[in-house]
Amino acid sequence: MYMGVIGKSPEIEILRELRGARILITGLSAVAGVDIARAFADIHARLIIHTTDMQPEVTELFALLSQNAAEMKLYTNPIARPEDSIRLAQNAQQAYGGLDAVINLQSISSAEMQSIATQEQVETLIAAKLSPLTHITHVAANRMRVVLSEGSVLNILTAPKPQNAREAAIAGIARTALAAMTRGEAGQWADQAVRINGVGPRSMSAQPAGATLTNEPDIAALALYLASKRGKTLSGHVFDADGLFAGGA
């Protein structure tokens, strides 16, 4: 939804506005978040990058990002436990004296899809995926409230394109959980000028409300738009993604 309005190429005023913006990106890996990080680095934002993926291609990416970003800080500790995700959000807030936008990345892998055999396993997996996003969203939004700062949080949960009805059902449950979290958080922070949105697996049971995000440059353009003043009227929405980050863990 709304991608027809947002477009795929950020307008020049958005790029100027976000120059020097303080951006936290969590969950970056070789298969998720590369184009998003590049998009913000290219407009000379100040980046805080979280990753646990230290493959050679990822370390090469960091070198490239550091050349273009106004500043960059890197965190590599796992954030699966609540205390770890909270600590990351707090450290990120302190890095540049606050945050203007947060992009949290999570993906359900093909292997995880295939390993699920029960409803309980589905619920456990989705809870594990959404928990860090929820804690980081709370800390970031609360800090924005305290300092009377407008801000944006975009929580991205993607899954590979379903190969059968069972996988489609899992993706649908994941989207429903993300949508509930997004609406709840958006409602909680609505009067504080903090915007909460999501990107989730496209529902196979309904026609999408707008264009579907089919590649990461689409998501990068969306993240730029939502972080800018142009996106200040959008909160509580979950945008459709189709089969992204299929190799993610």
Predicted regions, residues:
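C-terminal helical subdomain
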Residues: 2-7, 191, 198-199, 209-247
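Conserved mid-core segment of classical short-chain dehydrogenase/reductases
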Residues: 78-90, 94, 107-124, 167-170
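Rossmann-fold scaffold of SDR-type NAD(P)-dependent oxidoreductases
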Residues: 26, 99-110, 129, 155, ...
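Conserved glycine-rich Rossmann-like NAD(P)H-binding loop of the short-chain dehydrogenase/reductase
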Residues: 44-60
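Amphipathic alpha-helical dimer-interface segment in Rossmann-like NAD(P)H-dependent oxidoreductases
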Residues: 90, 127-148, 186-187, 191, ...
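Active-site loop of short-chain dehydrogenase/reductase
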Residues: 21, 71, 97-101, 144-159, ...
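Canonical Rossmann dinucleotide-binding motif of NAD(H)/NADP(H)-dependent dehydrogenases/reductases
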Residues: 9-48
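Catalytic loop of short-chain dehydrogenase/reductase
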Residues: 108-109, 115, 124, 145-191, ...
